């Protein structure tokens, strides 16, 4: 597959000016400071389910997210732990739901607690979801989520999703079997963008692992991506002439390249140079702007699948070293 974007050496040097939107920090402080207002339960609920796996305990999770509305997930924990566990909180790719409880077990098998967040309103691709997005979308929105609530940051879909994600991390910080100082967030594509946003919104994380992250330098992605979801924005603007400035202003509050400038936790990025869904220059933008210590794995001949199982092995080693000693992996400086 040919490269879908700038060549690697140009991506390494690519540092566009991305002005932060006005009131960015105040917007997010206000969003996260809002109290739940729909009468939902004010604490997480965990119901153990039998997956037929005696070495792993699995819980059907319901955590109050945006506006206190319940967001579902799975929590996997190794049996027999005698001390608080390190924890990996995972956010999912575009269209994917939490799936079945026995599907994602790698992190629990490695000895960590593993919390998977069901992305509200999603779950039609690869794995089913069960969490609805009850907030109405904007009239005339393109099918998908990038233009849902596009009129303003206050109504946009990802305001709700990012808030849900922060609440999932907060839930693990007070879980009696989790070490609050050893929480890592991760995700692929959309999940990688969410992980970067959480890294900028939640201080004190142990680590961040964004893979081929979506929602980075969104304005560029909308102009050069060959495949969805960024193409949703172009489809919307083909019909709604004169709204370009307003659309990209709204989306700028959810651009992970901005949130990356607020992050401080160590990070392990992956970028695929033949990615037509999340063009590599958009991912490099977030990587270069990331304010914490960072490492990068580049998969020069891969598309949106990224490093696949090879990169999972890189992540396992990185988290092990993060929790038990100084990192030993290859580091690329910005």
Would you name each region that the model predicts?
Residues 1-56, 328-334:
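N-terminal targeting or regulatory segments adjacent to alpha/beta-hydrolase or S9 domains
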Residues 73-77, 83-94, 114:
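Short beta-strand element of the alpha/beta-hydrolase
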Residues 99, 105-106, 112-163:
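Cap/lid segment of the alpha/beta-hydrolase catalytic domain
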Residues 144-188:
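Gly/Ser-rich "nucleophile elbow"/oxyanion-hole loop immediately N-terminal to the catalytic nucleophile
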Residues 196-243, 298:
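Hydrolase active-site cap/lid region
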Residues 263, 269-271, 275:
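Short beta-strand/loop motif that positions the catalytic acidic residue
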Residues 273-278, 305:
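Acidic catalytic loop of the alpha/beta-hydrolase fold
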Residues 293, 298-316:
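Histidine-bearing beta->alpha loop at or near hydrolase active sites
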